[in-house]
From Swiss-Prot:
The gene is guaA. It comes from Campylobacter jejuni subsp. jejuni serotype O:6 (strain 81116 / NCTC 11828). This is GMP synthase [glutamine-hydrolyzing]. ATP binds at S223, G224, G225, V226, D227, S228, S229. It catalyses: XMP + L-glutamine + ATP + H2O = GMP + L-glutamate + AMP + diphosphate + 2 H(+). Residues 196-386 form the GMPS ATP-PPase domain. Catalyzes the synthesis of GMP from XMP. InterPro entries: Class_I_gatase-like, GATASE, GMP_synth_C, GMP_synth_GATase, GMP_synthase, GMPS_ATP_PPase_dom, NAD/GMP_synthase, Rossmann-like_a/b/a_fold. HAMAP family: GMP_synthase (MF_00344). The active site is at C82 (nucleophile), H169, E171. Homodimer.
Length: 511
């Protein structure tokens, strides 16, 4: 079992993933586990500290989430955040009740006592609150470390036990020194060293792959995106002669994608590539399917079938490698009390029975860590910084049924969007950019004639790890040129709209 410096117990907060991400940025390996993980599993991880995340429940409610009480007797430093703070207070017999004044948004705190958390930090700070309950009295043995206008017990702790509790969320960017607070907890309370990096990760994963695979062969599924490219490079660094890299044209790719992928692997990466045209089978199975979850599961099942057929042609193939990321695992609701957002074609969308064992060497890291790993493995910046492209491809960028005419419309619009972003220098400034073909038509006027054609939506977002995202503030003239070109050059589209929603509440992809 992989060891972790700090374990984050997930009580259902939308920010739980950010806690782990912020710690990893400091070189500390943090791992997220369900709130009800067993004490034995916690001990097996040999952590140096534990963090209790926030969550939507109330500790006094009948449906409250509780972890094993034994964690408070392990002798490990513990940091409670929001719900985790209230859980700690509740455990030590303090009263937690509904707050008369709920706090959502920015607040100012003032540090009242020096502690490991606030070492070398200002006395006054801006933080991010998101709570509707409050701690009414201080737990016995604890003392106040910081206050806010509405929270006299905003931060409290027991320095001897190294237990700390925060009413605010240090993991979000709005908390001015939140990242420093988490770093201080790891460094001064838990005695963690900053040794986690992609160099050490690559070495560990290569050893793990060799140990798990032995002399067997591995089919590596690639799409041309950064995730699968990094997986292929990592496998090649560990067991090059045992890796069979397979690219499947599922008919759901962007314009020119197949040719780009084949060139990249054979010429840029120096990796032999088997290319399979399975577009007919994918598109036939997607016919008349409109539900996005069904699309994902059909695509996931069909991918596996295609790979299993290819595996039969090669002796000793026992494994299938995929570029599943930590964000995929999280959004498919594998950990904690979080709700399922959507199944990913390479997680929840997979069939229950597989004749190949699955190997996912990136499933413990975030997108920006994948990019860093790619550079560590020698991949070019051109490959590493390509915009993310989903496994289900254009199928989840077409609202409703997927068919060849719709795919052709979407491809043409997408080419124009990317051309304009690259020519204006905006492509490299953004996290992801694509078009969505909406399942609606609208009235227009072109050349004095009435039109009734398709609408397309432009989605361009800024992000660092894909867990949260904001829409990109593209200049109006750039948007205008994109819209004008799509409407003039793509027959069948007469309206272009821009998606200005952020994640959360929206996801980056529409389906």
């Amino acid at each position: 079992m992989k060891k972790a410096d700090i374990l984050v117990l997930d009580f259902g907060s939308q920010y739980t993933q950010l806690i782990a991400r912020r710690l990893r940025e400091q070189g500390v390996y943090a791992e997220i586990l369900p709130f009800n993980v067993s004490l034995a599993d916690i001990k097996a991880k040999e952590p140096k500290g534990i963090i209790l995340s926030g969550g939507p429940a109330s500790v006094y409610a009948t449906d409250a989430y509780f972890c094993d009480k034994g964690i408070f007797d392990l002798g490990l430093p513990i940091l409670g955040i929001c719900y985790g703070m209230q859980l700690m207070a509740h455990h030590y017999k303090a009263t937690v009740a509904p707050a008369g004044h709920k706090e959502y948004g920015k607040a100012n705190i003032e540090v009242k006592k020096d502690s490991a958390l606030f070492k070398n930090l200002p006395k006054k700070q801006t933080v991010w609150m998101s709570h509707s309950d409050k701690v009414e009295n201080l737990p016995q043995g604890f003392e106040v470390l910081a206050t806010s206008e509405n929270s006299p017990f905003c931060v409290f702790g027991n320095e001897d036990k190294k237990f700390f509790a925060l009413q605010f969320h240090p993991e979000v960017q709005h908390s001015e020194f939140g990242k420093n607070i988490l770093k201080n907890f790891a460094k001064y309370a838990c005695n963690c060293e900053s040794v986690w990096n992609m160099g050490s990760f690559a070495k560990t994963q290569a050893e793990k792959i060799r140990e798990e695979v032995g002399s067997d062969k591995v089919l590596c599924a690639v799409s041309g995106g950064v995730d699968s490219s990094v997986v292929a490079a990592l496998l090649a660094s560990a067991i090059k002669e045992q890796v069979i890299v397979v690219f499947v044209d599922n008919g759901l790719l962007r314009s020119g994608e197949k040719e780009q992928v084949e060139f990249m692997f054979k010429n840029t990466l120096g990796i032999d590539l088997i290319s399979i045209d399975a577009s007919e089978i994918f598109l036939s199975r997607l016919a008349n399917v409109r539900d996005p979850e069904q699309k994902r599961k059909i695509i996931g099942n069909t991918f596996i079938e295609v790979f299993e057929e290819e595996a039969k042609k090669h002796k000793d193939v026992k494994y299938l490698a995929q570029g599943t990321l930590y964000t995929d695992i999280i959004e498919s609701s594998v950990v904690g009390a979080s709700k399922t957002i959507k199944s990913h074609h390479n997680v929840g969308g997979l069939p229950e029975k597989m004749n190949l064992k699955l190997i996912e060497p990136l499933k413990e890291i975030f997108k920006d860590e994948v990019r860093a790993l790619g550079l560590e493995l020698g991949l070019s910046k051109e490959v590493v910084y390509r915009h993310p492209f989903p496994g289900p491809g254009l199928a989840i960028r077409i609202m409703g049924e997927v068919n060849r005419p719709s795919l052709e419309l979407l491809r043409k619009a997408d080419v124009i969007l990317l051309e304009e972003l690259k020519s204006t220098g905006w492509y490299d400034k953004t996290w992801q950019a694509f078009c969505v073909l909406l399942n609606i038509k609208s009235v227009g006027v072109m050349g004095d004639n009435r039109t009734y054609d398709n609408a397309v939506c432009i989605r361009v977002v800024d992000a660092s790890d894909g867990m949260t995202a904001t829409f990109s503030h593209l200049p109006y003239e750039v948007l205008e040129n994109i819209s004008r070109r799509i409407i003039n050059e793509v027959e069948g589209i007469n309206r272009v709209v821009y998606d200005i929603s952020s994640k959360p509440p929206a996801t980056i992809e529409w389906e």
